[in-house]
Amino acid sequence: LAESILDRFEIGATTALTLFAPRRMGKTEFVVQDLLPMARERGYLSIYVNFWDRKQDPADSLILGLTKATSQLSTASKIKQNLSRFKAGGIRTPIGGANLQLQGLSTDSKLEAIQTLFDRLLTDGRKLLIALDEVQHLGTNAAFEPIVYALRGLLDPHRDQVHVLYTGSSRSGLQRLFRRRNAPLFSSSQQIDLPEFGTDYLAYMAKIFQQATGRVLNLDACKEAFRLVKRVPYDYRQIIDLLILHGGEDILAITQAYLADHSLEAIYQAEWQALKPVDQAVLVWIIKGKSGPYTGEARQFIANQLGLDSVDTATVQNAVNRLRGASKIAPVSLGCYELEDPYYADWILNEVQHGT
């Protein structure tokens, strides 16, 4: 996938791509550990910005990411002259970025710093690959509008030198941001999905486990464990770590214990009870149904769930809008949706099955 992305950039097929994957599916690891190192090998100067690093102020996230990228400059020390107003302080990114004291700076000062940093990176002469992780966060607050406009001002004039990978873990959040009329920056980006991990990944992890412990895992048991954690690599890696720690080879027993320890029962119960009955019915149909929620069959199912003779399309549309606004569902094709959280989908089915 990393080669494919870079090849598309290099042949001029596009200057911007959007990579979607639900949380904990390995998206950030792919970008940081695979894509960006490969880009550097191909002569790119790489920039990684995670807008969840500093959720309250994405400008800080952008400054931190750009500052970290200056370590790739042969004359990185010169950047200090441009940032003399920043004092060494206690802000540190999770990936070990530079320390900067940003607290108390005005928005204008931060935007000026962003422009200065970006200009300095451009003057290096290499092509830039900037990965903007969890970019959908920019659409969650009107106060973040200056960052959206700043990004447009940074990127648009330099499409011949700058390639962009937008990434996000909320399909609905990305769609809301990209469809905004006042954010044409994102409209030209082509979307790709992070491929799901399969048997090759499980065999690789089993090999790593054997090298670390001398113990052999049954591949069929690994497949079942992976299925139980909804094919989420993060959870599967946690299970492998627990198995290394506790000993033995019973990956299914460790998986069941892990799921019990990380149950979201209380959270899901509260979320479910806070939903309107029609929203609950729409969720159940989306999980169980074979068509979108607007068909006659779907609306009759929803009506039956509510104890009504019928429901109109507008009622269903309002429910869908609420669920999308709360990032509970996201469209996957015209008129069809899926839940953003597969664990929540399983919990709902179990809730309906037991009639609670």
Model-assigned labels for residue ranges:
Residues 207-267, 277:
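Amphipathic alpha-helical "lid/sensor" segments that cap RecA-like P-loop NTPase cores
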Residues 133-135:
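Walker B catalytic acidic pair
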Residues 1-6:
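N-terminal pre-P-loop "Q-motif" helix
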Residues 137-143, 150-181:
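Sensor-1/coupling segment of RecA-like P-loop NTPase cores
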Residues 176-227:
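Helix-loop-helix "sensor" segment of P-loop NTPases
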Residues 14-25, 29-129, 138, 144, ...:
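P-loop NTPase nucleotide-binding core
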Residues 7-14:
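Phosphate-binding P-loop
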